[in-house]
Every structure is written in C-alpha cells, then in structure tokens.
C-alpha cells in the first residue's frame, strides 16, 4: 500500500476474478480462446496480451487470459465450464487508486508486464501476478512494494494423485510506503489548477520534503491497471493538452 504523510491511503489492493488457462491441459489454445471470446467478452487487447504471455511462460504455468471478470462473465462461464478443461476462474489482487487523477503524475501506476519486462524480471518472484510498476513512485519503488509468492511442492502420479508433500513456503507481502506528500495540500493545489494547464510543486523549506506535486490536466491511472483500451489510450495520447506528460 502507498500512503500520504498522514496515513491517507493513496494506492490500494483489492481482489478481482481472472480467467486463467493451463498450457499443460489445453491442446488447441487458439480454439479455446476463440470459443471463450463471446462467453467472457474478450477484446483484441485481451487476446494479444495473452498470446504474448503464453510465449514467455513455461509449460507448467497457468497463464492469465482476462483480468477483472464481471459477474455476468463468471455466470456465463459457469454454465459451460465442463466444455473447457484447463480453464479456471481464480482470484488475484490488483491495484486501485482511490483518488483517481489527483496523484497520477507522482504515484504513477502499475500495469500488465510486457514482453520486454518479462525478459528482465525474475519470473519466480512474479508468479501469480501480471502487474509491475510502470511510471512514478510505483516504478521507482517496485522492489520495495512487490512481495514474493509462496508455493507448495508435491509429488504426484501420472493421474494427478498426490503421493506426498515435499515442502511449502508462505508468501511475503510487499512493504508499505509512506510519502512526504500531504493529501490536503495536494487537493488545494489541484483546485487552483482546475481547468488550466500548469504544474504546482510545494516544498517544505526546512526539510526539502515535497508536500504537493500536481500537473494539470491529469489522467485516471486506474485505466492502465488491467490494460487500457485502444480508444481510451488514443484519447489521452492525442489530447492537445498532453495529460500523460
């Protein structure tokens, strides 16, 4: 979690339902994805991201197809689950920024791990998550904020029956981070820039701490967490006021 200097929550974690596929249990991955598309409303971005993750994953890994399934997605899949061996609905933690645009330029956001990042990270440390810090505080303090997944090793026979448990390691949650920013001052600075282009930085002259850092216009970082759609990204990218910068 990320907090301001007074303990106000700036970046939260919450559980979402995700569709994952087992490479070991699915012979025709493309056909499975095609049949799942109308059931859980897969977009082109969902499919392209999944294909990239499949190529970079190991044979024994489960690969996330879609994050943040709706209740309707889950209900439709539940009715036909027997037709999709190797496909499961799981719960994963994802990031949420409760104040939206207010801290976007300083906190940044997390997003799905891309092909370049997959080559540089320790895959074991990121098992069970698809998210990594992209910009701002989230990227600068990724190593501190990111926890470590747990695991259980077992020995099984050819039919999947467990013969014995070989070992278990509990997961470790990431560290909390307290910033020098002050939510109240950040809000006042944002109000002063409402409807205008510009930036405000407030610094405590005694300590050098940054108390507020606002750039206007801003953007909603929550759009990037589960994968921003093409239309939303184009609107931000092509905006003459350049909210992403």
Which residues fall in each region the model found?
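Periplasmic/cell-envelope proteins involved in peptidoglycan metabolism and beta-lactam response
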Residues: 1-245
């Amino acid at each position: 979690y990320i907090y301001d200097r007074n303990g106000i929550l700036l970046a939260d974690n919450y559980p979402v339902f995700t569709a994952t596929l087992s490479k070991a249990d699915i012979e025709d991955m493309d056909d499975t994805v095609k049949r799942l598309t109308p059931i859980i409303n897969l977009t082109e971005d969902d499919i392209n991201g999944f294909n990239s993750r499949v190529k970079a994953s190991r044979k024994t890994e489960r690969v996330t197809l879609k994050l943040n399934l709706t209740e309707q997605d889950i209900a439709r899949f539940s009715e036909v689950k027997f037709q999709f061996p190797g496909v499961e609905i799981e719960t994963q933690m994802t990031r949420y920024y409760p104040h939206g645009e207010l801290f976007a330029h300083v906190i940044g956001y997390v997003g799905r791990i891309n092909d370049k990042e997959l080559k540089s990270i320790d895959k074991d440390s990121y098992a069970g998550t698809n998210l990594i810090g992209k910009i701002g505080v989230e990227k600068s303090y990724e190593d501190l904020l990111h926890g470590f997944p747990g695991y259980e090793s077992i020995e099984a026979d050819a039919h999947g029956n467990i013969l014995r448990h070989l070992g278990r390691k509990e997961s470790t949650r990431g560290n909390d981070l307290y910033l020098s920013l002050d939510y109240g001052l950040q809000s006042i600075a944002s109000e002063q820039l409402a409807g205008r282009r510009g930036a405000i930085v407030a610094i405590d002259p005694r300590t050098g701490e940054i108390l507020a850092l606002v750039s206007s216009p801003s953007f909603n970082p929550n759009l990037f967490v589960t994968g921003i759609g093409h239309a939303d990204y184009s609107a931000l990218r092509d905006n003459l006021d350049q909210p992403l910068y």
